[in-house]
Amino acid sequence: MTTTPLAPVAQARSLLQLTTAYHQAKALHSAVELGLFDLLADGPATAEEVKDRLRIVHPLAKEFLDALVALELLEADGDRYRNSPAAQAFLVSGASEYLGGTVLQHARKHYHVWAGLTTALQEGEAGSGAEAHGPEAYPKHYEDPERARQVMAHFDTFSSFTAEELARRVDWSGYGSFIDIGGARGNLATRVALAHPHLHGAVFDLPALAPLAGELIRERGLEGRVRFHGGDFLTDPLPSADAVVTGHVLPDWPVPQRRKLLARIHEALPSGGALVVYDLMTDPATTTVHDVLQRLNHGLIRGDSSSSSVEEYRAEIEEAGFRVRQAERIDNLLGDWLIVAVKP
């Protein structure tokens, strides 16, 4: 089967759309930064009302709102604007699957990192200009409580959808407890626990996150079933559990530390215990443009180029003494792979 080549003008138009794709991203970023979707959550407003309540003074305010209509983020009814169903569901603060946290992270950090891509490629340094990258960056992120809260909102965006997939795809019936290593403030752990009432969960992450984790655990009424442990998972004792979950943690570390962590998890688990790993993993048979760009993004943010294939993950997990029981792609925001392995 052959495909008809695009006419020159169509090819040129496609390239033009690509080079101006940031127009769409920045329109969304600014709308969230301004609090537009929160403003319209309770009802529609005119352009003048929006300008007044959000203190917008630029004469292009109406064109900005019309652009959001064209992007299907707003809907227009006469001279009034309201949130589209998607914006109401995902871009209003407090929504159960709020995406605004990651939109703000992309607006305030990732966008600027990508602006330095050329320099990063030529000079060999990560484009973020951060003081630290990889695992060393996280303690610095969490020194300031407000910054830590912003980072948690970014992480929550992804872990909300991942939790749904893990709750559905992993057979939890044979386990009574689990611990999420590097589980941030516990968004994934609490969601999995809510989906499976027989489970008791725990989160192991840096001590600075304890207040935010406690806040979320109380908010979801799980004080008796989910707990937080602060510490260093490479040196401190790991709490006992029937299963260990870890996601987007292993690539932060060089191979020796990764192997050390997997060995420590294996040692901590009982016979029959499960290791549940989810992460961006390369797979030639299913790779998409989104996958490749996400790996590039993660490398720029983390300051390295680490990306492992499904087979490399499987090999490291088996080398640690586990037997892989399940490996499949899951339907979360990043299109992660899920590997479930058992300690014999």
From Swiss-Prot:
By its UniProt entry, which PANTHER family does this protein fall under? Answer: O-METHYLTRANSFERASE CICE, PUTATIVE (AFU_ORTHOLOGUE AFUA_4G14580)-RELATED
What taxonomic lineage is listed for the species of origin?
Bacteria, Bacillati, Actinomycetota, Actinomycetes, Kitasatosporales
Q: What happens without the gene?
A: Cells lacking this gene are unable to produce the tetracycline intermediate anhydrotetracycline (ATC).
- Catalytic activity reported: 4-amino-4-dedimethylamino-anhydrotetracycline + S-adenosyl-L-methionine = 4-methylamino-4-dedimethylamino-anhydrotetracycline + S-adenosyl-L-homocysteine + H(+); 4-methylamino-4-dedimethylamino-anhydrotetracycline + S-adenosyl-L-methionine = anhydrotetracycline + S-adenosyl-L-homocysteine + H(+)
GO terms for MF = O-methyltransferase activity; protein dimerization activity
Function text: Involved in the biosynthesis of the tetracycline antibiotic, oxytetracycline. Catalyzes the dimethylation of 4-amino-4-de(dimethylamino)anhydrotetracycline (4-amino-ATC) to yield anhydrotetracycline (ATC). Also able to catalyze the dimethylation of 7-chloro-, 6-demethyl-, 2-decarboxamido-2-nitrile-, and 4-methylamino-derivatives of 4-amino-4-de(dimethylamino)anhydrotetracycline.
- Residues holding S-adenosyl-L-methionine: 205, 231-233
Q: Give the similarity note.
A: Belongs to the class I-like SAM-binding methyltransferase superfamily. Cation-independent O-methyltransferase family.
Q: What is its EC number?
A: 2.1.1.335
A biological process term (GO) from this entry: antibiotic biosynthetic process
The record's listing under InterPro entries reads: COMT-like (IPR016461), O_MeTrfase_dom (IPR001077), Plant_O-MeTrfase_dimerisation (IPR012967), SAM-dependent_MTases_sf (IPR029063), WH-like_DNA-bd_sf (IPR036388), WH_DNA-bd_sf (IPR036390)
- Which UniProt keywords are listed? Antibiotic biosynthesis, Methyltransferase, S-adenosyl-L-methionine, Transferase
Protein name per the record = N,N-dimethyltransferase OxyT
According to UniProt, this protein's pathway is: Antibiotic biosynthesis; oxytetracycline biosynthesis
Q: Which organism is it from?
A: Streptomyces rimosus
Q: Which Gene3D superfamilies match?
A: Vaccinia Virus protein VP39, Winged helix-like DNA-binding domain superfamily/Winged helix DNA-binding domain
